[in-house]
Amino acid sequence: MSYDALFSPIKLRGLELKNRVVLPGMNTKMVKDKNDVGEDLPAYHAARAAGGCGLNIVELVSICPECHAYLYLGLYNEHHRDQLRKITDAIHAAGGKAGVQIWHGGFVPEEFFDKTNKLETPDTLTVERIHEIVKQFGYSAKLAVEAGFDALEFHGAHTYLPHEFMNPSLNKRTDEYGNQSLENRCRFNLEVIREMRKNMPEDMPLLMRLDAIDEMLPAVTTQDETVQFINWAAEAGVDAIDLSRGNARSLATVYEVPPYNLEPGFNMDNIAAIKARVNIPVIGVGRIVDPALADQLIREGKIDMVAVGRAQLADPEWCNKSKEGREAEIRRCIGCTEGCYDKVIDPKAKHITCTRNPALCLEYKGLPKPETAKNVMVIGAGIGGLMAAEYLKARGHNPTVYEATDAPGGHFVLAGKAPKKQAFTDAVMWDAEECKRMGIEIKTGVTVTPELIKEVKPDHVIVATGAHFVAPNIPGLDTAKDVYVAEDVLAGKAMPHGETIILGGGGVGCETAQFLIAHGVTDVRVMDSKRVGNKMGMLRTMFLDIEYPGETIKKSRGSKITAVGDHEITYAFTNKAKKTVEKTRHFDSLVIATGMHSRPTQDLTDACSELGIPCDVIGSAKKADMGIEATADAYAAAMNV
């Protein structure tokens, strides 16, 4: 299919872009000590530029030390400028154009700051300090020009400082920058725009990121006010508006990094309504993962350009594959947000990752060819085993995948049974097709035994046999009636009825609850000894409250099931007096979703050890965990063969 609109050129001031695709600024966490740029961040951007992206926007850069969170780059001195030059050089060498997102975070939570920095106690900005910040935006713009960027973006969305000035409930001021009028609320942003323009060449475009809708705050900027501001911003020197959605002060956070719960293009009606009333190009943001949708939105005049973010994290060749009619080869984002968001807020994570692309942020390593091609036995055709085989083949090895069941897919097929998660099933089926396309044999219906390993004599073995259900040790559970396993429910082998209790509030338990609601079971309670939504990730947990408000799905946290009787459970919890109390609760159906346990693998690893065959155990076969851990293990194992 041809996507002529998507891949048509567009000119912003003096900059001509070869297509309408923008890689938006996204936090990668690849910043080093002293704001240094290593080899990883330039390689990350070079991969997307070489993949055909029209404009790469480098993530948030802080304009001053006071707002410099350790997660982000800075751009307020010449050292920063010289470090960022590494990124622009890499993008240009790969045939792309480079933009940078210039930022002041405003009310940034304390936990985002490096504790070694001594930060002043937050206080009301004086007018003098506001003027200094305006100048600092201008100086960052000057440094960005010197660093070789082709375009600049002023970040004014997501309750960062510019948004805080514009929003009538966040702006508490009573002076000329206060909330008495729209002109006052917009004054700071317009001053920043003019100051940045003064420090930029006449032919260099200035973009601005805004929210297409201000929401879930005590008071909001209306659409009429947003349109008025955009028109003022255009007069002040903004050449295109990048319309996003979401804020860090409410449940609207979910719109900033939209998970699979939101439909692709969920923000486009808001954007189109604004575009119809402004006279500068509009960049549309809103979980666009399909080139056909992106092209359609541009053809229909709803947007002029499209931000393709997470889709290009999952596949840096998204643009080239789309343009060349190879859409079926695109490794698609599934909207899990486990790597691109959860790893951002995980202090242990060194950088973002991706379930579908475990090489994300590791592009600089390439795919080194081995001195000798090895015959590798991959045991298990789930998400981990298939991914390992793909990377092995790409490097030049000869993998063969063995699967005990009659079809590939593993637990990712079941994961796709929950509402709005079809992309998970599609992803693992894509992996199976990709293996076939690459010439990798998948032998189904074959259980690998130590004897088979001895017979085949592979050079290397990767065990990816996954995990299986093991019933929890609860008195009475083994004899109770109307007890089901979540795995069987999702597979369609069983359907609970009536008043249903789900034991286990992790991802499987919560998604089973969603599955049951979708299939007409109206009385569902999820119980967990810790919290409901455990290990689901922050954004997907938030969607439990958004999509299933109130008592739609009842939630009981801190509840430990101590016994199961005749359609009755006994559970213990700690009351407000901090005393342990036991109670009983009736059920018509009880669903066990307490998690999985790794399948036994010692017979396989022992056989490999006896034969002197190197062996790696990966994913849930090593430790029952999330899909993102399985694919990360798969990549690491494949790279080490």
Indicate where each model-derived feature is located.
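Rossmann-like dinucleotide/flavin-binding elements
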Residues: 373-402, 443-457, 464-480, 484-538, ...
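SH3/SH3-like beta-barrel fold
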Residues: 569-571
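Feature representing long, continuous alpha-helical segments
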Residues: 268-272, 276, 352, 386, ...
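Short beta-alpha connecting loops at secondary-structure transitions
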Residues: 254-260, 304-305, 413-420, 618-623
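Short gly/pro/ser/thr-enriched loop/turn and capping motifs at secondary-structure boundaries
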Residues: 249, 312-315, 407-409, 491, ...
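Flanking helices and flexible, charged tails adjoining ferredoxin-like Fe-S electron-transfer domains
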Residues: 193, 363-371, 381, 387, ...
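Flavin-dependent oxidoreductase catalytic cores
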Residues: 1-379, 383, 388-394, 399, ...
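Rossmann-like dinucleotide-binding cores of NAD(P)H-dependent redox enzymes
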Residues: 401-437, 491, 513-561
